Regions:
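PAPS-dependent sulfotransferase catalytic core
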Residues: 212-294
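Amphipathic alpha-helical interface elements that mediate macromolecular binding in regulatory proteins
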Residues: 47, 51, 163, 184-191, ...
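Phosphate-binding beta-loop-alpha motif at adenosine-nucleotide cofactor sites
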Residues: 39, 170-196, 227, 231, ...
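PAPS-dependent sulfotransferase catalytic domain
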Residues: 1-177, 197, 202-203, 256-318
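Helix N-cap and loop-to-helix transition residues
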Residues: 140, 178, 185, 209, ...
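Short, surface-exposed acidic
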Residues: 199-218, 225, 303-306
Length: 318
């Protein structure tokens, strides 16, 4: 894809719509004991998990527009540490920052969602198309996969992000699961998430109120989420800047003086796409592409059993 759309912030590649000041503020933030973080590599079920957590915290009354959602569940890297001061609590902070590029706490709670690298790559490709200017002519999937396996995409290498979190998957303050598990049994995992957040307050409440449980499941359906998250980055930047003064984030003011690029972009997928398992089969259609991925995966995971997470979904053998 187009490396002009990447910005290096202290060794971390990020999308050029992020501002270095806010990324650094997120990196340096010292977590509070009541903080809940949703940590993922991009396009691994981030928004879905955020919305589930929001609905659990609000007893099924999560925001139905992106602006209110971002105030309640801030994209930390984008909005900066200032977002923690205006966020209603309980709330959840979403971050794509790698494990070793942010301050960790043994008392805050972390939800990490992993997705198989093939489907992640496909979803990431379609998402980044929407952030690639039309002046970039080569937007083929083949070109993207070369950048993906080289770590020349926002937030760097997939496994460099996943493996440190995988090593912490059994920590008592970490809930680690896969997108595929969430997709296959959403009901069970919503309950596990609720128990992790607070079994008495949220988990037991869902067990005792089937109507509430179903309300949350319906709200977090793919169809409903497409309606809620149907706008682009420029829209939610402008809407955050238009908040009343008492709710406005100082960290977002940088977008007034350093606004987003107005270049016309290729058509991308937005924040919510197909939500399918196995769409990779429609994209990795050549032996060259499959071998490139297999070689990369074998090299990156030679000292880890992490690929066992997806032993049951018929990925290419490794």
């Amino acid at each position: 894809m187009n490396e002009e759309c990447l910005v290096d912030v202290d060794g971390l590649l990020v999308n050029d719509f992020l501002r270095a000041e806010n990324v650094r503020a997120a990196m340096k933030y010292q977590p509070r004991e009541d903080d809940v973080f949703i940590a993922t590599y991009p396009k691994c079920g981030t928004t879905w998990t955020q919305y589930i957590v929001c609905n659990i915290f609000t007893h099924g009354n999560a925001p139905n527009n992106v602006t209110d959602f971002l105030v309640q569940a801030p994209y930390f890297d984008f909005m900066g540490a200032d977002a923690t001061t205006k966020m209603p609590r309980p709330g959840a902070l979403m971050t794509h920052l790698p494990f070793n590029m942010r301050c960790h706490s043994n008392k805050a709670k972390y939800i990490y969602v992993a997705r198989n690298p093939y489907d992640c790559a496909v979803s990431y490709y379609h998402y980044l198309l929407g952030h690639t200017p039309k002046t970039c002519a080569d937007v083929s999937f083949e070109t993207f996969i070369q950048a993906f396996v080289n770590g020349r995409v926002p937030y760097g290498d997939f496994f460099d992000h996943l493996l440190p979190w995988y090593e912490h998957r059994h920590d008592p303050n970490v809930l680690f699961f896969t997108y595929e598990e969430l997709k296959k049994d959403t009901r069970a995992w919503v309950l596990k998430i609720a128990d992790f957040l607070d079994k008495t307050k949220y988990g037991d409440a869902l067990r005792e109120d089937e109507k509430l449980f179903q309300k949350i499941l319906d709200a977090c359906s793919l169809g409903n989420m497409r309606e809620v998250f149907n706008c682009g980055c420029d829209t939610f930047v402008s809407s955050l800047l238009a908040l009343p003064e008492e709710g406005r984030l100082q960290s977002m003011e940088i977008y007034r003086t350093n606004p987003l690029s107005k270049k016309e972009s290729h058509e991308g997928s937005g924040r919510v796409r197909k939500g399918k398992i196995g769409d990779w089969k429609n994209h990795f259609t050549t032996s060259e592409l499959r071998e490139k991925m297999k070689s990369w995966i074998e090299e990156k995971t030679k000292h880890s059993d992490v690929m066992r997470l997806w032993a049951d979904i018929n990925l290419p053998s490794h």
